[in-house]
From Swiss-Prot:
Substrate binds at residues 49-52, 108, 113-115, 119. This is Glutamyl-tRNA reductase. During catalysis, the active site Cys acts as a nucleophile attacking the alpha-carbonyl group of tRNA-bound glutamate with the formation of a thioester intermediate between enzyme and glutamate, and the concomitant release of tRNA(Glu). The thioester intermediate is finally reduced by direct hydride transfer from NADPH, to form the product GSA. The gene is hemA. Homodimer. Pfam families: GlutR_dimer (PF00745), GlutR_N (PF05201), Shikimate_DH (PF01488). Possesses an unusual extended V-shaped dimeric structure with each monomer consisting of three distinct domains arranged along a curved 'spinal' alpha-helix. The N-terminal catalytic domain specifically recognizes the glutamate moiety of the substrate. The second domain is the NADPH-binding domain, and the third C-terminal domain is responsible for dimerization. Keywords: NADP, Oxidoreductase, Porphyrin biosynthesis. The keyword Secreted does not apply. One of its GO terms (molecular function) is glutamyl-tRNA reductase activity.
Length: 446
């Protein structure tokens, strides 16, 4: 029994391939059941986002891995070898490490992003509802969620914005202080503007005004966020109401010029106005930045913020990798130990049965002529023989349990001695079956 992951992401597969193997939520139940019905696949969880599709599975037979690839190939109508060329596969400790890195945002396109942790949790909970999660995947995903939270808490890897839109809002917040109660004018209604509005609203701005050359598009974006749309030829009039102006159009010339801004600033009675120009080519004439009461940042200013923040995230990622190394090691040690316990108990029980049977047979053959002292000596000798015979294999098994392949040695011992551990050798977890962090594996309660 082992955990494996078969997946593809933005690094291994182009968008055309990722689209074919993207599983919308309404198909996930069918996908999970289809996978778990395949021979050798005991349980599974599927994570499907815009940048990755991953199947985490517990395999009871080696054929299970090939059957996962076959399933994916059938779903997208491609040959198995074509699918394999775009996927990666990790097993044993490396599959656990990969899951922990994914939940921590270290495997994401945007290093340290937070959305993936919620996506991992959602995928896990959905598979639980469908009934395709066994105790081993349960433990792995519970711990992955805990590790993802720990990494973010201890390293702050998600604290520094690395997108231009987020950096624009963060720069405004750092310069102006709280954004609550501020009026914002967005010039342009493209994707970047949409993302910027989302970030602004999360910081509690009072209102958003949207202006765009295509007025219907301005209306659409404003309606999406409960803002106000204004016509492009009224831009300067409405600029007088704004504390922050963020411009991102596709114009090939300056959209906001210095001369009209002089009148706008006069009407504002000395109130400062903060410009962020994230367009390329620039929307705001650099001369605007020299006007009294104006603070102007352009894309290069923002890029320096992004670069600095990305460097901070990379430094945090080094610390995150150390945390993950320790967490993987602890998880595998706890898991290996729990696998060994039923085998050790069964082996001792078998030794005790053999000792008792052979001792009874020997005493019957000797008759009732032995003194109490002689019986005690013979019984002690039998105990010592069994204890010494089992001591070395049990000691070595416990040490081997601390390796990623530990449970294989446990399986081998069960076969060699024809042992039948309780629950088939599957660890009995302490506490609630629906929750299984490492503390449960160690028998400390959940």
């Amino acid at each position: 029994m082992l955990i494996t992951v078969v997946g593809l992401n933005h690094r291994t597969a182009p968008l055309a391939v990722r689209e074919k193997l993207s599983f919308p939520e309404h198909t996930l139940k069918e996908v999970l059941r289809g996978l778990s019905d395949r021979e050798g696949v005991e349980s599974c969880v599927v994570i499907s986002t815009c940048n990755r599709t991953e199947v985490y599975a517990v395999l009871s037979e080696e054929d299970g891995l090939q059957n996962i690839w076959c399933f994916l190939a059938e779903r997208c109508g491609s040959p198995v070898e074509a699918i394999k060329s775009h996927t990666y596969n990790y097993s044993f400790g490396e599959s656990v490490r990969h899951l922990f890195r994914v939940s921590s945002g270290l495997d994401s396109m945007v290093l340290g992003e937070t959305q993936i942790l919620g996506q991992v949790k959602q995928a896990y909970q959905f598979a639980q509802q469908v009934g395709t999660v066994n105790w081993l995947l349960n433990c792995a995903f519970q711990q992955a969620l805990a590790v993802g939270k720990r990494v973010r808490t201890e390293t702050g890897i998600d604290k520094n914005p690395v997108s231009i839109s987020y950096a624009a809002v963060e720069l405004a917040r750092q310069t102006l202080g709280s954004l609550e109660g501020r009026e914002v004018l967005i010039v342009g209604a493209g994707k970047m503007s949409e993302l910027t509005v989302k970030h602004l609203l999360s910081h509690g701005v009072a209102g958003v005004i949207v202006s765009n050359r295509s007025y219907p598009r301005a209306v659409e974006l404003a309606a999406q966020f409960g803002g106000r749309a204004v016509r492009f030829d009224e831009l300067y009039r409405w600029m007088g109401h704004a504390d922050i102006v963020i411009s991102c159009t596709a114009a090939s010339h300056y959209v906001i010029r210095a001369e009209p801004m002089t009148s706008v600033l006069a009407e504002r009675g000395g109130r400062a106005i903060f410009f962020i120009d994230i367009a390329v080519p620039r929307d705001v004439d650099p001369a605007v930045g020299h006007l009294p009461g104006v603070v102007l940042y352009d894309i290069d200013s923002l890029q320096s913020v992004v670069d600095a923040n990305l460097a901070e995230r990379r430094r945090a990622a080094v610390a995150a990798e150390r945390i993950i190394d320790a967490e993987v090691r602890e998880f595998l040690l706890a898991l290996g130990s729990r696998f060994v316990i039923p085998t050790v108990v069964a082996l001792k029980k078998r030794g005790e049965e053999i000792k008792r049977n052979e001792l009874d047979r020997a005493l019957n053959r000797l008759g009732g002529e032995l003194s109490e002292r002689e019986l005690k000596v013979i019984s002690s000798m039998a105990n010592s023989i069994v204890s010494q015979l089992l001591h070395e294999p049990i000691t070595r098994l416990k040490k081997l349990a601390l390796t990623p392949e530990g449970h294989f040695y446990s399986d081998a011992l069960q076969k060699l001695f024809n042992l039948e551990p309780e629950n088939g050798g599957v660890p009995t977890l302490v506490g609630r079956t629906e929750s299984c962090p490492v503390s449960c594996l160690k028998g400390k309660g959940c």
